[in-house]
UniProtKB/Swiss-Prot annotation:
Any one GO biological process: actin crosslink formation
Lineage summary: Eukaryota, Amoebozoa, Evosea, Eumycetozoa, Dictyostelia
TM segment ranges: none
Subunit structure: Monomer.
Function text: May contribute to the structure and reorganization of filopodia and pseudopodia accompanying cell movements.
Keywords: Actin-binding, Calcium
Cellular component GO terms, alphabetical: cortical cytoskeleton; cytoplasm; filamentous actin; filopodium; intranuclear rod; phagocytic vesicle; pseudopodium
Native source organism of the sequence: Dictyostelium discoideum (Social amoeba)
UniProt-recorded name of the protein: Calcium-regulated actin-bundling protein
């Protein structure tokens, strides 16, 4: 993310919204916290948002995961010229031009007749169609909270759900709440699964290309490709999935929907419900794609 530039004595957000909100100024400490969250990968930004607003936004979590998150990753891949998912390192923000593309793809998805159930099931998640000129104005004047000329997933989420969310309130709800050790362990276990998926997919792609070569080399690659699902890379992936499932299960039993203040007696209670939901949903997706297939 580009270096955040804040004008002297202007740590607030010069935006307008019904009620208190985007006009409320952020303290220097709150702005620093906000910028730090916005530097995290898209998925971790989403978890921070869901933790803060779980009571209000839990019914929209699936849209945020399967549509919002997938679309912003797709836009980031498009920007970076990456076509294969396993080669993608999750980003944290988009410049305004790619943010326009993100919104364009989001609107296109929601307007597609085959996705009409998303409109009825997740009404407050539906993006507003705007011209490119108007959208860029909105991005500059209303979405870009920290004035860095870029759009993070957190900024998109706060603006999309502005009827109940805003930057100042987000910071108030989220600051001084550490990630619980068991939740961190589960998150890192899922990141290990991602590493194993990448190693597996890279080898699979290499063998697929090599199998197209005529002669002995191509035949050898074809044979290795046929055995890849019983090879060491798949075994390592299976082990990582099992370990992640155990870690997520432990975190879910201990802290599903519970509060955690990191031992700070006067810090208040920070919900972990969003993190627990996200990890379970992510694990479900990984198991569906790479876990043992039912016969």
């Amino acid at each position: 993310m580009a270096e955040t530039k804040v004008a002297p004595n202007l740590t607030g957000i010069e935006q307008t919204k019904a009620g208190q909100s985007f006009t409320e100024k952020l303290s220097a400490e709150a702005m620093e916290f906000f910028c730090n969250v916005a530097k995290l990968p898209f998925s971790q930004q989403a978890v921070h948002f869901l933790n803060a607003y779980w009571a209000e936004v839990s019914k929209e979590a699936e849209f945020i995961y399967s549509v919002g998150w997938e679309t912003i990753k797709y836009a980031d891949m498009h920007c970076k010229g990456i076509q294969l998912v396993f080669k993608y390192d999750e980003g944290n923000d988009l410049d305004f031009d790619i943010a326009l593309y993100f919104y364009e793809q989001l609107c296109k998805f929601c307007e597609d007749p085959k996705n009409k159930n998303y409109a009825t099931t997740y009404p407050i998640s539906q993006p507003q169609m705007l011209t490119a000129l108007k959208r860029k104005q909105e991005l500059r004047e209303k979405v870009d909270v920290n004035f860095d000329g870029r759009v993070s997933f957190l900024e998109y989420l706060l603006y999309q759900y502005k009827d109940f969310a805003n930057p100042a309130d987000f910071c108030t709800r989220s600051m001084n709440h550490d990630e619980h050790p068991e939740i961190k362990k589960a998150r890192l276990a899922l990141e290990e699964v991602n590493k194993r998926i990448r190693a597996y997919e890279e080898e699979k792609a290499r063998l697929t290309e090599e199998s197209k070569i005529p002669g002995v080399k191509g035949l050898g690659a074809t044979n290795m490709l046929a055995q890849i699902d019983s090879g060491p890379l798949k075994e390592q992936l299976n082990f990582a999935l099992i370990s992640a499932e155990a870690a997520v299960r432990t975190a879910s039993k201990k802290y599903g929907g519970a509060a955690y203040s990191g031992g700070a007696g006067d810090a208040g209670a920070g919900s972990s419900a969003g993190a627990i939901w996200w990890m379970n949903r992510d694990l479900e997706e990984k198991k569906k794609r790479y876990g043992p297939q039912k016969k």
